[in-house]
């Protein structure tokens, strides 16, 4: 997966980069994991117009992403790596051995056909999800929970990664891409 740097033709494009999606699977999204996405037309939650020239844009389907990764110790096979119009990161369709299908954020290095797993039995490799206390210090992580069982809230964008700096009792020090050090409970995934 290559990253293309944009030329600074306009101020909005200065420093901008895009993923070159040459190795994505050209398949339809899983119908059971998509819902229609209603456009805001430049309105806020009261219905007041906040952006005068904002229109509907291209029709999109929202892909339901599994940010919690709560199917523990059940292996899954990566069926496809797909484009998601609603986020900068690509997504991976997982087929679990019990027959369930779920989308996850696709980390760098995940390929079609790989086996992934969430839980304490999982090894350290792209696509697996473990509790922060079970990871070695210095490893790069993404999709980090702030509260146990709430689902990933930090470091979900494409190309970003946080680093586990230290473990101290029940809490762990995580360095975010901004350079900020956060204390996160070791039971979080």
Whereabouts are the PLM-identified features?
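Basic, glycine/proline-rich low-complexity segments that contact nucleic acids
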Residues: 1-87, 108, 112-189
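Short, flexible active-site-proximal loops enriched in glycine and acidic residues
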Residues: 85-92, 102-104
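Short, structured beta-strand/loop micro-motifs enriched in basic residues and often containing a Trp
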Residues: 95-102, 120-126
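Beta-strand/loop nucleic-acid-binding surfaces
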Residues: 99-111
């Amino acid at each position: 997966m290559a990253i293309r740097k944009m030329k600074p033709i306009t101020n909005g494009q200065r420093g901008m980069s895009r993923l070159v999606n040459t190795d994505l699977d050209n398949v339809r999204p899983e119908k059971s994991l998509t819902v229609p996405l209603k456009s805001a037309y430049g309105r806020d939650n009261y219905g007041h117009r906040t952006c005068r020239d904002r229109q509907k844009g291209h029709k999109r389907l929202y892909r339901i992403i599994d940010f919690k990764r709560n199917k523990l110790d059940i292996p899954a096979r990566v069926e496809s790596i797909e484009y998601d119009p609603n986020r900068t990161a690509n997504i991976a369709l997982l087929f679990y051995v019990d027959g369930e299908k779920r989308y996850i954020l696709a980390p760098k290095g995940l390929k079609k056909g790989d086996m992934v797993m969430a839980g304490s039995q999982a090894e350290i490799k792209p696509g697996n999800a473990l509790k922060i206390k079970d990871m070695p210090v210095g490893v790069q992580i993404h999709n980090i929970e702030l509260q146990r069982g709430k689902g990933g809230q930090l470091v979900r964008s494409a190309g970003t990664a946080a680093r586990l700096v230290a473990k101290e009792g029940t809490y762990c020090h995580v360095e975010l891409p901004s350079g900020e050090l956060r204390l996160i409970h070791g039971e979080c995934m």
